[in-house]
């Protein structure tokens, strides 16, 4: 009976053994598992029963096998529960840990020892007794003081997935530590155990030399007995993560951001993450040079990385696709790059916002001395912020307004003051408060950089690309803006001379009036970048004479014309008073009056308007001004045309779409006189004034001059200006 029962149970038992051997790969508690990691984590107290050949003849052997099966299942359950407990413990502890660690991304099959899988630069010798690591997540911690730092190790590469808010909130803090200190006061100093601080605080980022060298020395002492592992580690550190060769994530010894994030996400994932990952990578590669000779790979790899890192960093506002650096990656690196890509885009936008906020605030980041070398050029970080501000509409308006209004001369300096005479006098009327018409639109002052460099927007744009010929010191302060502004104006004076004299020949925008003067000025190369210039313009530098056209705003021209209609000659006190009202110099007012008298006289002689006192100043008068009305002694009647048909006859026979000749005479004559002078002077100075004349200018002045005066050449010249 026993034999038959055992024979009935034999097939099911045999199937169960076969399934167990095929599926689990773990075997009994004492047999060799599939991976060396799981072999290490097996409890040493578990029984080790060797496998015997399968025999089904005796029930005692079957009972032994059943007992072994139960023990195997219990061991598997225990290991699984231990995995779960350790994983949960690591997730909670890693949130409060900022210690820099070295984490295995793929455990090598040749070695399963703990010191080669986990290294902490400060006090690493304390962790030499680790039993082992199991698939990046099983830690058995011998010391409660090291819990926060050690438990974070396997968690760091997963941080973009598990804790996105922490990841993106902490990463910009490496570049702007002051913002983080204000937002999270005392977080890092309070959460890190006292035994793990070793003199590091978040403020040490501002001065990396002393404290990071101390930690680098500690790391060298701790890593002295890890020769082979250090070579892998240094190679991975300088090549942004050889993820597939059992190497480790770069430990940034002083970064408050998680080390796995700073190296893997910034280099593999984004390539656009602002300055944090780049600064961490280069600072660690520089300061870890003392430990051993494999670090000599760093200069090559740094040089190799610059074209990849600096290119997207200058234009990081657009969410650039991740750069997977294929020549440095192998194995798991591709998958990690794809896993970090989504987080990288969020990070880039967050860093852009942080840069704009910092630049628009009251402080600039106090960059450490080793940043220029790692960024590649001295103004890179400041260009980063300036370019960011120009991409945000609210910020660009703010910087233009403050730069425009902050650099004006409080008094009325001489016209021979250096470069700032252009910046201060040309657009200064928009800040004058003497009349409602003086509130100009400073946002539209940006003009083409090749025609002139007066507008603040162009000065800021050229600041981003002209650190070589721009600022002398390249210091990232507010003076760098002004220095580049002045030097850019100096560098473009040749184009000012060539194109600015033509006035309206190059299309300017409507907020500017193209009336102006050409004056002999002392063009001084302002090399000190002070942005000032005293009243006499003598700062000890050699001067050279140059003709330059100074353009006036509409408000300044309007005030000059109004005064010219009242009084054609001004005394010296009157000139000074008028100049102080419209923020010009007395010399500029005098030259403008001289030029205006000459223009009106020449217009009288050439066009035969000697008997028209109202038209003497016609081209400078607003069309609706009372003094703009022509004299009734000599009137040229305009012929109005609508849809190709002349509107003739008395007012009772006029069509609905025709306008009476008598009501349109004054405006038409005003426009006609204005456009004769426009054609003669070769400048479209008063298009905006004539365009305001109730829509009558196009047909009225054309036929008035074509039929009434018979000037075909003037009509042909007007055709170029009026469609």
Swiss-Prot record:
Query: Which InterPro entries does this chain map to?
Result: HD, Homeobox_CS, Homeobox_NK-like, Homeodomain-like_sf
Q: Where is the composition biased (Basic and acidic residues)?
A: 10-22, 61-92, 226-235, 278-289
Write down the SMART domains for this protein, in alphabetical order. Answer: HOX
The record, for PANTHER family, names: HOMEOBOX PROTEIN NKX (PTHR24340), HOMEOBOX PROTEIN VND (PTHR24340:SF82)
Q: Where is the composition biased (Acidic residues)?
A: 512-528
The Basic residues compositionally biased stretches are 298-307, 703-716
Its annotated compartments are: Nucleus
Region of interest (Disordered), residue spans: 1-115, 224-307, 465-549, 703-723
Q: What is this protein called?
A: Homeobox protein vnd
The record's Gene3D superfamilies line, in alphabetical order, gives:
Homeodomain-like
State the Pfam families in the record: Homeodomain
Q: What superkingdom does the record give?
A: Eukaryota
Mind listing the UniProt keywords for this protein, alphabetically?
A: Developmental protein, Differentiation, DNA-binding, Homeobox, Neurogenesis, Nucleus, Transcription, Transcription regulation
| A GO biological process held by the record | negative regulation of gene expression
Q: Which GO terms describe its cellular component?
A: nucleus
Composition bias, Low complexity:
23-36, 97-111, 483-493
Any GO molecular function: DNA-binding transcription factor activity, RNA polymerase II-specific
Query: Where does this protein bind DNA?
Result: 545-604
Tissues expressed in: Expressed in the CNS and midgut.
Q: Where is the composition biased (Polar residues)?
A: 37-48, 237-255
Primary localization class, coarse: nucleus
């Amino acid at each position: 009976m026993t034999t038959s029962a055992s024979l009935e149970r034999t097939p099911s038992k045999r199937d169960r053994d076969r399934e167990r051997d095929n599926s689990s790969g773990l075997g009994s508690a004492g047999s060799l598992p599939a991976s060396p990691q799981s072999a290490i984590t097996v409890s040493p107290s578990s029984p080790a029963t060797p496998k015997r050949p399968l025999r089904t003849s005796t029930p005692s052997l079957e009972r032994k096998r059943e007992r072994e099966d139960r023990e195997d299942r219990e061991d598997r359950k225990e290991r699984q529960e231990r995995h779960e407990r350790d994983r949960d413990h690591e997730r909670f502890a890693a949130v409060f840990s900022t210690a820099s660690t070295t984490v295995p991304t793929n455990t090598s099959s040749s070695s399963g020892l703990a010191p080669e899988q986990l290294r902490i630069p400060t006090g690493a010798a304390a962790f030499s007794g680790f039993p082992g690591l199991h698939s990046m997540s099983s830690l058995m911690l011998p010391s409660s003081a090291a819990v926060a730092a050690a438990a974070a190790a396997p968690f760091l590469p997963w941080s973009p997935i598990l804790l996105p808010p922490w990841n993106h909130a902490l990463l910009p803090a490496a570049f702007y530590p002051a913002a983080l200190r204000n937002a999270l006061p005392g977080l890092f100093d309070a959460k890190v155990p006292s035994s793990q601080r070793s003199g590091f605080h978040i403020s040490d980022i501002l001065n990396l030399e002393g404290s990071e060298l101390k930690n680098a020395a500690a790391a060298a002492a701790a890593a002295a007995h890890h020769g082979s592992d250090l070579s892998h580690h240094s190679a991975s550190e300088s090549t942004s993560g050889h993820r597939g060769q059992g190497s480790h994530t770069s430990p940034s010894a002083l970064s408050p951001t998680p080390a796995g994030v700073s190296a893997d996400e910034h280099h593999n994932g984004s390539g656009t993450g602002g300055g944090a990952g780049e600064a961490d990578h280069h600072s660690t590669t520089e300061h870890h040079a003392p430990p051993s000779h494999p670090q000599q790979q760093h200069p090559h790899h740094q040089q190799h990385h610059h074209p990849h890192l600096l290119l997207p960093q200058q234009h990081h506002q657009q969410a650039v696709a991740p750069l997977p650096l294929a020549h440095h990656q192998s194995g798991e690196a591709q998958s990690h790059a794809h896993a970090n890509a989504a987080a990288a885009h969020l990070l880039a936008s967050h860093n852009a916002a942080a840069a704009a906020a910092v630049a628009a605030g009251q402080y600039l980041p106090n960059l450490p001395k080793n940043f220029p070398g790692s960024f590649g050029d001295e103004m890179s970080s400041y260009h980063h912020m300036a370019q960011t501000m120009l991409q945000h509409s609210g910020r660009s308006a703010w910087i233009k307004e403050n730069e425009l209004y902050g650099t004006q001369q409080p008094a009325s300096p001489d016209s021979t003051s250096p470069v700032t005479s252009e910046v201060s006098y040309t657009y200064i009327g928009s800040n004058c408060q003497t009349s409602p018409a003086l509130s100009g639109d400073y946002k539209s002052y940006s003009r083409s950089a090749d025609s002139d460099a007066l507008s603040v927007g162009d000065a800021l744009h050229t600041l981003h690309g002209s650190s070589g010929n721009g600022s002398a010191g390249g210091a990232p302060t507010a003076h760098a803006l002004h220095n580049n502004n002045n030097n850019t104006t100096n560098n473009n004076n040749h184009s000012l001379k060539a194109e600015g004299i033509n006035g309206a020949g190059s299309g300017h925008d409507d907020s500017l009036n193209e009336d102006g003067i050409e004056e002999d000025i002392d063009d001084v190369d302002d090399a000190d970048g002070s942005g000032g210039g005293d009243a006499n313009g003598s700062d000890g530098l050699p001067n050279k004479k140059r003709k330059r056209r100074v353009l006036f705003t509409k408000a300044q021209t309007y005030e000059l014309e109004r005064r010219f209609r009242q009084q054609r000659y001004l005394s010296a006190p009157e000139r000074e008073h008028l100049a102080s009202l419209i923020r010009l110099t007395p010399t500029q007012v005098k030259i403008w009056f001289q030029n205006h008298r000459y223009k009106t006289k020449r217009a009288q002689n050439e066009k035969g308007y000697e008997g028209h006192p109202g038209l003497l100043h016609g081209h400078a008068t607003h069309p609706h001004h009372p003094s703009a009305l022509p004299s009734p002694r000599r009137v040229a009647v305009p012929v109005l045309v609508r849809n190709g048909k002349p509107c003739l006859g008395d007012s009772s026979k006029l069509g609905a779409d025709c306008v009476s000749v008598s009501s349109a005479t004054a405006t038409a004559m005003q426009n006609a006189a204005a456009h004769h002078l426009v054609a003669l002077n070769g400048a479209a100075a008063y298009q905006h004034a004539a365009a305001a004349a109730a829509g009558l200018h196009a047909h009225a002045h054309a036929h008035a001059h074509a039929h009434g005066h018979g000037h075909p050449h003037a009509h042909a010249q007007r055709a170029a200006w009026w469609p």
